[in-house]
Amino acid sequence: MTNAVQTHMPAARAKPKKAIQGEKLRGYDKVARIPIKIIPTVEAKKKPDWIRVKLSSPAEVARIKSTLREQKLYTVCEEAACPNLPQCFADGTATFMIMGDICTRRCPFCDVGHGRPNELDKDEPRHTAETIQGLGLKYAVITSVDRDDLKDGGAAHFVEVLNESRALSPNCLIEILVPDFRGRMDIALDLLTETAPDVFNHNIETVPRLYKAFRPGSDYQHSLDLLKIYKERRPDIATKCGFMVGLGETEEEIYKLLDDLKAHNVDMITVGQYLQPSKDHAPVDRYVHPDEFQRYMDYGKKIGFFNIWAGPMVRSSYFADRQYYGEDCPAPIRSKKALAAEGKLGC
């Protein structure tokens, strides 16, 4: 007698919605048209014990959100569903996302909405500056959606935000996390060389072999060149780059990626675990053990990065001020039971 194997074909889905100006496409509607199709996840991998965040103050989280809504501002913390949001907001920090909340790219790892963005908000630079001042920030991170619809990719808007913020908070350090400005690199670098941040950050996201699947519309070498050329123009400004693990890369590919970043004049590195925002996004290939993250940090220090933070919950702007000042990466939060099972619990 043989056992019948029952297979279930995915139910037919409606055609994905078309992009309409000002409307965000998320989940299936966002990723349905990328070159390498995403098969919806039926059962997600169980998260290990080291995927944890600290409990936070609900009152402080509510205060930050209220301030942001009053100023009509967005944060990548909220739009990208960052798991560290409660901890960072409770600590009085947030990463401002300028140029709206609609991205012109369709990266299947990211939860930021895709579509046809609205025109830039001319008041956003002032509102951002007022919020930085109102929160009393000493270190601010400003990022953006990709704006392939703009001739300069939004670089001039970054400059306006920098100028307005420094006028109101001259002692606040500002890190900008920029898109790749593909097709617009020269004009963008001209603008951001003249009006420079304290840290120039651009995320390369993954290893080159996985670019077609996870970064459609982007180019690995272009991102490396962006970082290198900026550092050549402004050697006095710290450069920074982040990427994810758990997408299907190998450990050897990560070491090669770190070598590439070092060869392209990057000073600081962040490495974090990819977490799937929804069943329609790219699935998690594996959960990387904290010991592997430690090997990446050890290697990064060996080849000469000023600082490298690598850990399950590390994100590009995670305690960015601490990394800038040279502090070591916080250890992941783990249960005593799990540590004991691995023989790592002291007497």
From Swiss-Prot:
SUPFAM superfamilies reported in the protein's UniProt record: Radical SAM enzymes (SSF102114)
One Gene Ontology cellular component: cytoplasm
Cofactor: [4Fe-4S] cluster
Pathway: Protein modification; protein lipoylation via endogenous pathway; protein N(6)-(lipoyl)lysine from octanoyl-[acyl-carrier-protein]: step 2/2
Cysteine pairings via disulfide bonds: none
Cofactor, how bound (note): Binds 2 [4Fe-4S] clusters per subunit. One cluster is coordinated with 3 cysteines and an exchangeable S-adenosyl-L-methionine.
Gene3D superfamilies reported in the protein's UniProt record: Aldolase class I
Keywords assigned: 4Fe-4S, Cytoplasm, Iron, Iron-sulfur, Metal-binding, S-adenosyl-L-methionine, Transferase
GO terms of molecular function: 4 iron, 4 sulfur cluster binding; lipoate synthase activity; metal ion binding
Positions annotated to bind [4Fe-4S] cluster 2: 103, 107, 110
Catalytic activity field: [[Fe-S] cluster scaffold protein carrying a second [4Fe-4S](2+) cluster] + N(6)-octanoyl-L-lysyl-[protein] + 2 oxidized [2Fe-2S]-[ferredoxin] + 2 S-adenosyl-L-methionine + 4 H(+) = [[Fe-S] cluster scaffold protein] + N(6)-[(R)-dihydrolipoyl]-L-lysyl-[protein] + 4 Fe(3+) + 2 hydrogen sulfide + 2 5'-deoxyadenosine + 2 L-methionine + 2 reduced [2Fe-2S]-[ferredoxin]
Annotated Radical SAM core domain residues: 89-306
Record-linked InterPro entries: Aldolase_TIM (IPR013785), Elp3/MiaA/NifB-like_rSAM (IPR006638), LIAS_N (IPR031691), Lipoyl_synth (IPR003698), rSAM (IPR007197)
Domain of life: Bacteria
Ligand binding ([4Fe-4S] cluster 1): 77, 82, 88, 317
Main location group: cytoplasm
Enzyme Commission code: 2.8.1.8
One of the Pfam families matching this protein, by short name: LIAS_N
Keyword Repeat applies: no
Location relative to the cell: Cytoplasm
Family per similarity comment: Belongs to the radical SAM superfamily. Lipoyl synthase family.
PANTHER family reported for this sequence: LIPOYL SYNTHASE, LIPOYL SYNTHASE, MITOCHONDRIAL
HAMAP family: Lipoyl_synth
Protein name per the record: Lipoyl synthase
Organism name: Psychrobacter arcticus (strain DSM 17307 / VKM B-2377 / 273-4)
Name of the gene encoding the protein in the UniProt record: lipA
